[in-house]
Amino acid sequence: MKITPVKALTDNYIWMIQHGNHAVCVDPSEPSPVLEFLVRNRLMLAQTWVTHPHPDHEGGAAALWRGYMESPVYGESDIEAATHTVTAGTQFTFGDGQVTVWATPGHTDRHTSYLLETSDGIHVFCGDTLFSAGCGRVFTGTIEQLYDSFQRFNRLPENTLFYPAHEYTAANLRFAAHIEPDNADIQTALKAAERTPTLPVTLAHERRVNPFLRTEIPAVRQRAEALVGKTLNSGLEVFAALRELKNAYC
């Protein structure tokens, strides 16, 4: 199985998963890049997976379905183009992989991640929940939901690969360095991120550089407390403070 990012819009990635001469597309913001990829690689679209109902994630799903009407569109009931409604725990297959749907709200009140388990490990297509060195903004969800989604991700094996839908890594790492200026892993990752695409990323890597997965680290908590000017008594409070600080960070 081969997984390829296809650039779309300004900073979106549409993830294309190939098995044989069939492919899945994840979060098609627009149809043209997907269609070009399929034609160039002589592939048939087998499935479309949508994580949440924002135009830059579902915008191309309806057009793709019209072009490949035997190709199901998976998504929750608020995904207009969905032909196969999913909920937490829904399972299906693609190629030799097993797909499990997780509810990972926070960015939006209903947000799906797709966990693809293959012989080489777990691949998580996480939309706008987790970014490398960062997390999604809270729109219609809650910070408590987003924190819980991160805690669930953090219980996966450390070699799990995450496939976010945006390349925000360099900006996120600059904020992470603001929180942990002495973290050598962040400095190394930032130098690399300025030169090349960074995704996917392992959970092991994110545990070293993502402040939103490091809320129990004393240096992170202390820095957040210093910046917000108050005591933070739990991982959730540190997480919420970091999200507010990131919102204001330039």
Swiss-Prot record:
It is an enzyme of class 3 (hydrolase). Zn(2+) 2 binds at residues 56-57, 128, 166. Coiled coil: none annotated. Its cofactor is Zn(2+). Gene3D superfamilies: Ribonuclease Z/Hydroxyacylglutathione hydrolase-like. Its EC number is 3.1.2.6. CDD domains: hydroxyacylglutathione_hydrolase_MBL-fold (cd07723). The keyword rRNA processing does not apply. The keyword Metal-binding applies. It catalyses: an S-(2-hydroxyacyl)glutathione + H2O = a 2-hydroxy carboxylate + glutathione + H(+). InterPro entries: Clx_II_MBL, Glyoxalase_II_hydrolase, HAGH_C, Hydroxyacylglutathione_Hdrlase, Metallo-B-lactamas, RibonucZ/Hydroxyglut_hydro. Keywords: Hydrolase, Metal-binding, Zinc. Zn(2+) 1 binds at residues 52, 54, 107, 128. Pathway: Secondary metabolite metabolism; methylglyoxal degradation; (R)-lactate from methylglyoxal: step 2/2. Binds 2 Zn(2+) ions per subunit. It comes from the Bacteria. One of its GO terms (molecular function) is metal ion binding. Monomer. NCBIfam families: GSH_gloB (TIGR03413). Thiolesterase that catalyzes the hydrolysis of S-D-lactoyl-glutathione to form glutathione and D-lactic acid. This is Hydroxyacylglutathione hydrolase. It comes from Neisseria meningitidis serogroup A / serotype 4A (strain DSM 15465 / Z2491).
